[in-house]
Amino acid sequence: MAAAGFYPPRLLPQVLISTGPGFYEDEHHRLWMVAKLETCSHSPYCNKIETCVTVHLWQMTRYPQEPAPYNPMNYNFLPMTWRLASMNTYRGTDAMHWRLLNHSQVGDTVQLILMLE
């Protein structure tokens, strides 16, 4: 049996539009779910003293069939829309910039990791 390998990721989404708390849809109608939301003052992605915010988005092939269990994550500060502003920066509808830290694919899972700048 072959081990799960890393594959070249697909093209970056140009736009991600919120469809509900923790869910976004891109311009190709692909669904993205907030898989992890980190707010901390010490992050492996952040070398600043101030608080860092990173969001991990996973591309899903379809909406979950069952309602999501209670999730303590607060999505209120995430933008309603992200637009790709450059090769490594997304701009939210709130005018905040989010740096692309990672765009990868392992098996069928495509992941984006964004950090608030």
Swiss-Prot record:
This is Protein TCL1B2. It comes from the Eukaryota. Coiled coil: none annotated. Pfam families: TCL1_MTCP1. PANTHER family: PROTEIN P13 MTCP-1 (PTHR14060), T-CELL LEUKEMIA_LYMPHOMA PROTEIN 1B (PTHR14060:SF2). InterPro entries: TCL1_MTCP1, TCL1_MTCP1_sf. Transmembrane segments: none annotated. It comes from Mus musculus. Belongs to the TCL1 family. One of its GO terms (molecular function) is protein serine/threonine kinase activator activity.
